[in-house]
A protein has these predicted regions:
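Non-catalytic, usually N-terminal nucleic-acid engagement modules in DNA/RNA processing proteins
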Residues: 1-70, 119, 155-193
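A cross-family glycoside hydrolase active-site/sugar-binding cleft signature
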Residues: 4-8, 21-26, 56-59, 75-79, ...
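A structural motif
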Residues: 51-53, 94-95, 142
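Histidine/lysine/aspartate-rich catalytic loop segments that bind and position anionic ligands
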Residues: 76-107
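Catalytic cores of alpha/beta
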Residues: 84-89, 122-123, 129-144
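Short, charged, surface-exposed secondary-structure boundary motifs
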Residues: 84-90, 106-114, 134-136, 153-162
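Donor nucleotide-activated moiety binding/catalytic core segment of transferases
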Residues: 96-125, 133-135
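Glycine-rich phosphate-binding active-site loops on the catalytic face of alpha/beta enzymes
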Residues: 102-105, 129, 138-168
Length: 193
């Protein structure tokens, strides 16, 4: 699993962290997308930074292909499984697409099992902010995920950049170990439906 760090107050001091896709390589202007719902501003920033970005969030709840740079992989946030259709449209137009699983239950109307079953894309666990969510992302073998600083500790601890870097290294070591559901011999004998 490859982890990403989106924009946060410490991001300038975390540019040298290895093993993560660090903002702006992972572009996720949550303020423009979620709070302001200012897609024009987001698109302008996307085009302006297109040579620095590897992966970006595709604007939520947009069911058509926007004029976005083609050199970037897009995480399409899936709030309802029918929104996988926009991922299909993007792929048909030669965009690199990753399906985004909404970690917060209030932003989706499906289970993680339904998402894994329905998605034919690489999968991204959006907004990993608890140990439970990290374990879940590893268990279900997500390809990518972005973590929030809340995963690393309390607010007072997060003021210490060295503490944050140490915790990021610990998480990277945990993620680099193999995870997922353990197969049993019975898995090989169950007849497919």
């Amino acid at each position: 699993m490859i982890l990403a760090l989106g924009y946060n107050p410490l991001i300038q001091k975390l540019q040298d962290v290895t093993g993560y896709i660090v903002y702006p390589k992972f572009f996720d202007n949550k303020k423009a997308l979620l709070i302001e719902r200012n897609y024009k501003k987001y698109l302008k920033e996307l085009w302006f930074n297109r040579n620095r970005i590897e992966v970006a969030l595709y604007p939520d709840n947009i069911n058509y292909v926007l004029p976005v740079p083609k050199n970037i992989a897009y995480v399409v946030p899936i709030h309802t499984l029918s929104q996988l259709e926009i991922a299909d449209k993007l792929r048909e137009n030669n965009y690199k697409v990753i399906a985004g699983y909404a970690s917060d239950q209030k932003y989706r109307d499906y289970t993680i099992q339904d998402f894994i079953k329905a998605s034919k894309y690489q999968n991204w666990y959006l907004g990993i902010s608890t140990k439970h969510e990290l374990k879940e992302a590893l268990f279900y073998s997500f390809d990518y995920g972005d973590i929030t600083l809340m995963l690393l500790g309390r607010f007072q601890q997060l003021r210490d950049v060295n503490y944050v870097k140490r915790k990021l290294k610990e998480i990277q070591q945990l993620v680099s170990k193999s995870h997922g559901r353990q197969s049993s011999i019975l898995d090989f004998f169950v007849k497919p439906r």
